[in-house]
Amino acid sequence: MTNIRKTHPLMKIVNNAFIDLPTPPNISSWWNFGSLLGICLILQILTGLFLAMHYTSDTTTAFSSVTHICRDVNYGWIIRYMHANGASMFFICLFMHVGRGLYYGSYTFLETWNIGVILLLTTMATAFMGYVLPWGQMSFWGATVITNLLSAIPYIGTNLVEWIWGGFSVDKATLTRFFAFHFILPFIIAALAMVHLLFLHETGSNNPTGIPSDTDKIPFHPYYTIKDILGIMLLILVLMLLVLFTPDLLGDPDNYIPANPLNTPPHIKPEWYFLFAYAILRSIPNKLGGVLALVLSILILVLVPFLHTSKQRSMMFRPISQCMFWILAADLLTLTWIGGQPVEHPYIIIGQLASIMYFLIILVMMPAASTIENNLLKW
């Protein structure tokens, strides 16, 4: 008799995705981040659900409802901080996951890669709207500044912004709709993640060498289930260290001041995971130019597969490309740092140089490095 997990219509899907999945034998810990993102998403949906039970999306009560969750709801404080810091862990895993894809040439799986880019954009939108919900100073002004960027779109810009706001400023209508979108988007992310996985399992996983491993596979369970469990335990350890010891480390103190449209905070800045894009936005003096650069800083990932000029897939055996990759990583850290600094000398020029470098590395230097390596292989 065949095992039920191989015949049952539902269990068969789970079996083919997580148990009997043929997996390359040499995938490293960089391949753990996919499962960690799944865990992060489940954690965010669960904590978010319990927060939504006590939260009110009204400008007069939103701030106090969050305070109520932390003070009066049983374990409300831990749920709130797990949700807030869970978002940070989510983005750490996302950046590592994308970085892995860039380094090992996983972007040659076009459908998987493009759905991944859509997932990244959707997650960024969700996180932005979630940051508005506590209705603190940084929530209000962050929402005002970022939604206002759409007014840079010629002709329809102003109408579009007012349509998103539901009025002539960020107000009750804006908060209510942001809560509605923030609630629904994680489920859309979950659906997209399933499609992401579906396309990945059409081709099978890449591996560090970038060489097809179809002749050499091992079952996902128990080898990678146990490896994933180790990753999950480490993720939860780091998250709980953050939550229990320094819950406000990654937050902004200004968000403990209730939203006040009449008082602008001295430095409006988003959460740390958006700072690199914010730095690129600020580095261009023109409004429309800044918005375009901001959008392109993420959408440039769609171009990466078409800029691949190397004869090899992975960067494992390409030292010049490796140098370019790590310069890009350092550049992104520089942009993240600049995004959190005030707009003054020398930060302005550093931000502008780092922004130019970002696009230059991806569009010019990486393809050039690959071409040089191709020619070196002929010697």
From Swiss-Prot:
Q: Which GO terms describe its molecular function?
A: metal ion binding; ubiquinol-cytochrome-c reductase activity
Q: Which residues bind heme b b566?
A: H97, H196
Q: How does it sit in the membrane?
A: Multi-pass membrane protein
Cellular component per GO? mitochondrial inner membrane; respiratory chain complex III
Biological process terms in GO annotation: mitochondrial electron transport, ubiquinol to cytochrome c
- Give the location in the cell: Mitochondrion inner membrane
Residues holding a ubiquinone = H201
Q: Where are the transmembrane segments?
A: 33-53, 77-98, 113-133, 178-198, 226-246, 288-308, 320-340, 347-367
Q: Which Pfam families match?
A: Cytochrom_B_C (PF00032), Cytochrome_B (PF00033)
Q: Which cofactor does it need?
A: heme b
Q: Which domain of life is it from?
A: Eukaryota
Q: Which UniProt keywords apply?
A: Electron transport, Heme, Iron, Membrane, Metal-binding, Mitochondrion, Mitochondrion inner membrane, Respiratory chain, Transmembrane, Transmembrane helix, Transport, Ubiquinone
* PROSITE patterns recorded: CYTB_CTER (PS51003), CYTB_NTER (PS51002)
Q: Could you say which residues bind heme b b562 here?
A: H83, H182
Gene3D superfamilies in the record, alphabetically? Cytochrome Bc1 Complex, Chain C (1.20.810.10)
Q: How is the co-factor bound, per the entry?
A: Binds 2 heme b groups non-covalently.
Additional free-text comment from the UniProt record:
Heme 1 (or BL or b562) is low-potential and absorbs at about 562 nm, and heme 2 (or BH or b566) is high-potential and absorbs at about 566 nm.
Query: So what family is this one in?
Result: Belongs to the cytochrome b family.
Q: Give a short account of what the protein does.
A: Component of the ubiquinol-cytochrome c reductase complex (complex III or cytochrome b-c1 complex) that is part of the mitochondrial respiratory chain. The b-c1 complex mediates electron transfer from ubiquinol to cytochrome c. Contributes to the generation of a proton gradient across the mitochondrial membrane that is then used for ATP synthesis.
Quaternary structure, from the entry: The cytochrome bc1 complex contains 11 subunits: 3 respiratory subunits (MT-CYB, CYC1 and UQCRFS1), 2 core proteins (UQCRC1 and UQCRC2) and 6 low-molecular weight proteins (UQCRH/QCR6, UQCRB/QCR7, UQCRQ/QCR8, UQCR10/QCR9, UQCR11/QCR10 and a cleavage product of UQCRFS1). This cytochrome bc1 complex then forms a dimer.
Name under which the protein is recorded:
Cytochrome b
Record the organism: Capra nubiana
In the UniProt record, what gene is named as encoding this protein? MT-CYB
